[in-house]
Amino acid sequence: MTKKTKATSGADEKTPSLPQYFSWINSTNEGSTEKQTIANLEYFKWLHDKYGMKLKIYAWDAGNLDGAGFYDNPYESEKLKKQYPNTYKPCVDKAAEFGCHLGVWGGADGFGDTPEEEQKRHDLLVHLCRDFGFMQFKFDAVCGWPREEKHLAFKRAIDECRKYVPDLIVLNHRLWLGEGEIACTTFLVDGVETYIDVHVCNEISGPHHRMYPLSRPLIPGLDRLAEDHGVCISSFVDNFEDDLIIQAFSRCLILAPEIYGNPWLIRDDEQARLAKIYNVHAKYSDILVNGMTLSEEIYGHNAISRGDGDTRLITFTNASWLPKTVTISIGEEIALADCEGKEYIVKSIHPYEEYIATAKAGDSVTIEIEPARAALILVQEKSKFEKDDFVLTGCKYETVYGPGATPDKVRIFKADGTIGSIGNRSVDYAAINGDSTIARPVYLGLLKTSPIPANLEQLYEATCFAADCDSLEAQSLKRSGDTKVPEVKAARDAFFNQEAYIYRGTESRAMFDGDSDTYFDAESKFMATRLDGGCLRVDLGKEYDISRIEIESFVVNEPTHEIREAHFEPLAQVSADLANWSDAPLHGVETTLDSYTIPVILASVHLTDHCEGKKCTATYTVNASARYFRLPCPMDRIFSFTAYDMNGNKIDLCAPHANNLLAPFDKVSFISARSLTVTLPEDYADGAYIAIGTDGIHGDEGVYCTIEYDGKQIGAFDRACCYPMNNWEYKAKTANCGFTYYFKLTPDMKGKEVKLHAFYKNECQVVTRAWVCDTNNKQPIAELNI
């Protein structure tokens, strides 16, 4: 194919990267709205005004022009008029307030069957660029496959668009465009999306869910006219920074840094960190286009050096539990040029900023790459560094940028009392000592073959009851907590309050919120996310004397693909201790509302329809003291779960926790076990956790883990690859290797003995090890103005 140039394709291999966000899984195929988009743009404007972060492109994904399987027109479509009653202009204007341009997802055809229809589609695309300054089109096979006879029509339209927006970026997602391909800027690498634990997941054990990006293959030849789908910030957001460092500085494609999803779900303190990555990339964007792969034998897997003859930014990765030592040769080996007699500053930019060394050409500088992390190292000629940059000595820190991307303050995470500075900035400080950096994992030991314990059911149920099967976005919100930033809150609210999210019934709290129209579990049946039929498990928070439990759910009049025939399991069970279970038989099913219309999200297109049916309440007789309730093959679309005391009064549950997708105990079979009894360290920090990781092929859902401490069974609150979940966009990825279970540690467990268990469903050659890991949520010991 003809070599792509700026004239033919909007960019070439030496075009500096364009920083971008795109809206996939902020909405799905139904598309966004003006209100939701404005809320998101206000968030990015806040990042711009507060931290100087520059976003060049905000790209709508599916459903905002074309949809899944159809083409559309914002001036004719009732759907789009409802979404954007004032056309796209209010969103265009809001983006322009902080120097941003819009882009949109669509199909590469839509040119109709007549010359008039072809011209109409042509004119629409040109209009978006000429009148609204659209800077990106993403053309995706999900919309439809372009007809061969329309390839030239596609090319003519894009060529005309570039008369008004010469640097228009056109993404080709999985399409054959023939003669029109030259008009496209990029292709999607391996067709891979990067929604963590939905489309990609860990294949090895690790302390977090983002091990895959640390070992993702490089693009052959370091081709930059490609698209890697960016970094998804929506699920399991811990360590998004490492993922983004690799995307922006290692691959450094034409779109970088590139994120998508829901970045407002990270913590408030992490927002400055996100902006910093964008700001550092912008500072060096002109020279980052020049990259080279370093020797794997010397520098490790996927080490990349980018820059010019005086300045190199080197990205390292470490996809292991142990620190990795790397020795950097200051000279031509990392692509420095004309370096004889020169001195260089070596500075860590990520995961912490830190002065490493002042070195001469020919020197070797040794650094350590933290376990399960990425690292970004700057090597720059000394006089240039002192003019353009700064580094603090005697500490590990991170820079917080202010308006205009100017360094404003530093957060100190570790200091030895001798903080100094090199370069064009200094700090006002008192003597500071302390360390709040993320501690390295502490090895506990290898789990070894042991008899299957007599209380296997109790141990299995402990982890099943601890599991979170809510949407991954709901889990991210719980992880990050409340925000004090109005723009962040508005973007979060816009996401969680959209109908397409609510109608999927992804959060178990709907059963307890007192709202008669919210429900839990709308898609587990037709999405086939239930394991062996699933099991509704409810931890009531504490033990109660219970007479009966009532569960209200929806019963459809005529089953559809999305709403299956209702089923009421005849026998539930309750327990006070997960070991001893008593039966709670179904007493009866009563119609509580004989006519009810429920909204339903249609599969694939994600548009809203409605189905007729009724509300029914199933009553289970308990007459026991219990904390735990389990019901195999449960009903779906559950409006409420209510327990009653022995006097028939409704119990106000203090802290219920529920899930619905893991297999009933009588449907699973474990054939072997391993265990480890170990004394925990005395000095772990608040928020620390135990990780039990299995490396090797264990089979789908092939290993489960639990711990015992002080006579109690403690289940894993999280797992990588994740537990099955009530999905937002798509169901959790299945994985047959690399499971890691995570268990919360409490202060009373310090220095105490615990027993770690692993149970296996298959004969497998695996290694299962345990570690104590530090929390990602570490706060600085000081904050200094610069």
Q: What is the meaning of each model-derived region?
A:
Residues 357-410, 430-471:
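C-terminal beta-strand-rich structural cap/linker in extracellular carbohydrate-active enzymes
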Residues 333-355, 434, 698-704, 713-718:
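Short aromatic-acidic-glycine turn motif
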Residues 290-311, 383-418, 662-679:
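Surface beta-strand/loop "capping" patches
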